[in-house]
UniProtKB/Swiss-Prot annotation:
Gene: FRB1
Residues annotated as binding substrate: H384, L385, R386
Keyword Zinc-finger applies: no
Native organism taxonomy: Eukaryota, Viridiplantae, Streptophyta, Embryophyta, Tracheophyta
Membrane-spanning residues: 121-141
Protein name according to UniProt: Protein FRIABLE 1
Species annotation: Arabidopsis thaliana
Cytoplasmic side: 1-120
Length: 631
């Protein structure tokens, strides 16, 4: 298996090839074409713009002539002659400038009365003449060298006439014509533009008056539950809770019994030494429970979900002081989104975005693969295509699947006791916008949004469910990659058997992508989009699934044209690209579960308006409502 080959069984398309060569040269059509220098063929390319006189007199009247002594040579000879005459003209200007400066210097020298000053001026004059001599020699040899470079394609001299000539010149395609390197992509489509971020920047600095860590009230053991991203955000909450209770946090235990059955430890996935070091001024973190407490039976406790800080400061802290060791068997969503004080909110972000760094082998491979996706300076899209068996079974979504596949999902749903919903109408759920997009729907969505078919797409997901589910996607976008097609077997050898380590790799590639899009609001989508907001509101597309599925159903029924469909899709998503907006607390009586997740949008809390009118605590607690206009 070769590295970096798109996983399209019906296509041999690979990452975009290097720029191709052609013998066609375009003459500018407008003054705008000459407002800047266009380079081709890399950093060594040169563009030269001649005067109108040079363009008009480059041929001697009538025909082009066919002999070797023709007044209007063809192909590359024409360009060499113009280049030589232009450089000669430039050299004559230099000589006139030197002559004028010499006369000026000599006149001053004659007026000098002091022999000492006269000697200094003579020395200066000689220095100027020596430098000028070397410049003339260097310019005299330039044409020959340029011709050699052109023959080697090291750089190209392109002759662009003035905009009064409005035609396309085709170079003689004989063996003597020179080749101009033309980049494959001449402009970046508008779809790759990033959102407007205003004056918002990350702000997670510790308070200047932060008190030093007190003597610990006890030790907190935590068993993080769920998939990687659910465990990740849960661990960040545990750091904040340990701070609230003045507890010493023991390195968390990871879930080994969930659907993924991954035996990886915290040290296998995260850089644990970095984690402890970054948070050293905030919370005491130890690798193991001290020996003197190992024999103590810990108090097991499942904290109440979405609890306020006061719950831990008052109720749980008392239990910690009494028992000295407490175990939390669940860590997901145990701290409220909006009520913790600003210092605790910033601590949650320091833990998530600064302290929790993946292990060295995962980080290194992530860098290699992201560079591989960006070969030839092409951007790439990371698509979280959550069309996996566990998600489809849990949600009851079976649109476009066969009857056998639907039965298979239903069996899985009934076999897992803690999944409460068993009988689900998948059709109704899809129309409500509560199903992940199918691969075909995702492809149509991306095409309607304006992504070209040559887009490099990295699929952030495990195994896509359903026979031939990706066929329609590959037909629209052939340059599709998964971790196992982008990396070699050797590169994946240390992480491939472990689902959480693969999820960490996907997380980094999604975080670093030029655009991230997700087809379902799962834990990874929340974690990645929040991290991208923190890192400068990198473009993140959040499809409006409810409106989109109704629109694509109309398209499939022939009730709407493709042009109208694409226009409507773009319009409905123009404000769903990851621009800043304030996370709003839930209304009275609303379940905290329905609020926007803190880690999906850390504004306010960890992102601040740095404009002049926003200062002091106001920057942290009351971010400018200007962000609402950017939503």
């Amino acid at each position: 298996m070769s590295v970096g080959v798109p996983v399209n069984p019906s296509s041999s398309s690979q990452l975009p090839a290097a720029p191709t060569t052609t013998t066609r040269r375009r003459v500018a059509d407008s003054q705008e074409d000459h407002s800047h220098v266009n380079t081709v063929g890399g950093g060594n390319a040169v563009v030269y713009v001649p005067d109108e006189e040079e363009t008009a007199t480059s041929c001697c009247g009538g025909g082009g002539g066919g002999g070797s002594l023709s007044c209007c040579p063809s192909g590359s000879h024409h360009n060499y002659l113009v280049g030589f005459l232009s450089l000669r003209k430039f050299r004559l200007v230099w000589m006139l400038m030197v002559e004028n400066k010499s006369k000026w210097t000599a006149g001053i020298a004659r007026n000098m009365r002091s022999t000492t000053n006269l000697g200094r001026f003579i020395l200066t004059l000689l220095s100027i003449l020596v430098v000028t001599f070397f410049l003339i020699v260097a310019l005299s040899g330039g044409v020959g060298r340029r011709r050699k470079h052109v023959e080697k394609h090291e750089f190209v001299v392109s002759i662009h006439p003035r905009p009064t000539i409005e035609k396309i010149i085709r170079e003689d395609e004989s063996s003597n014509s020179f080749q101009v390197l033309v980049p494959k992509t001449t402009s970046i489509p508008e779809i790759w533009n990033q959102p407007e971020v205003g004056n918002y920047q990350k702000c997670v600095a510790r308070p200047k008056n932060q008190r030093p860590i007190k003597q610990t009230n006890g030790y907190l053991l935590v068993h993080a539950n769920g998939g990687l991203n659910q465990m990740r955000t849960g661990i960040c909450d545990m750091v904040a809770i340990a701070k609230i209770m003045n507890a010493t946090l023991v390195l968390p235990f990871l879930d080994h019994s969930s659907f993924w059955s991954d035996p990886s430890s915290f040290k296998d996935i995260f850089d644990w030494k970095h984690f402890i070091k970054v948070l050293a001024e905030d919370v005491n973190i130890v690798e193991y429970l001290p020996q003197e407490f190992a024999s103590i039976k810990p108090l097991e406790k499942n904290p109440v979900s979405w609890s306020k800080s006061s719950y831990y400061r008052n109720s749980i802290s008392k239990l910690l002081k009494k028992h000295k060791v407490i175990v939390f068997n669940h860590t997901d969503s145990r701290l409220a989104n909006n009520s913790p004080p600003p210092s605790i909110q910033r601590l949650r972000c320091r833990a998530n975005y600064e302290a929790l760094r993946y292990s060295e082998d995962i980080e290194n491979l992530s860098n290699v693969l992201s560079s591989r996706l960006r070969e030839n300076n092409e951007p790439y899209l990371a698509l979280h295509l959550r069309y996996e068996k566990d998600m489809l079974a849990f949600t009851g979504c079976n649109h476009s699947l066969s009857n056998e596949e639907s039965i298979d999902l239903e069996k899985m749903r009934f076999s897992i006791p803690h999944w409460k919903e068993k009988v689900i109408n998948g059709t109704e759920r899809r129309l409500e916008g509560n199903c992940p997009m199918t691969p075909r729907e995702a492809a149509v969505f991306l095409k309607a949004m304006g992504f070209p078919s040559t887009t490099n797409i990295y699929i952030v997901a495990g195994k896509i469910y359903g026979q031939n589910s990706m066929t329609a996607f590959h037909e629209e976008f052939p340059n599709v990659f998964f971790h196992n097609t982008l990396a070699t077997e050797e590169e994946l050898s240390t992480i491939k058997p472990y689902q959480n380590r693969l999820a960490a790799l996907d997380y980094n590639l999604a975080l670093e992508s030029d655009i991230f899009a997700y087809t379902y609001d799962g834990n990874m989508a929340k974690a990645v989009q929040g991290h991208r907001r923190f890192e400068g509101f990198r473009k993140t597309i959040n499809p409006d699934r409810q409106r989109f599925v109704r629109l694509i159903d109309r398209l499939d029924a022939g009730l709407i044209s493709w042009e109208d469909f694409s226009s409507k899709v773009k319009k409905m998503h123009q404000h769903r690209i990851g621009a800043p907006y304030l996370r709003q607390p839930g209304k009275a009586g609303m379940s905290p579960k329905l609020e926007e997740n803190f880690y999906a949008n850390p504004l306010p809390g960890c992102v601040c308006d740095t404009s002049e009118e926003q200062t002091g605590l106001n920057r942290f607690e009351r971010p400018s409502l200007r962000a609402q206009s950017l939503r």
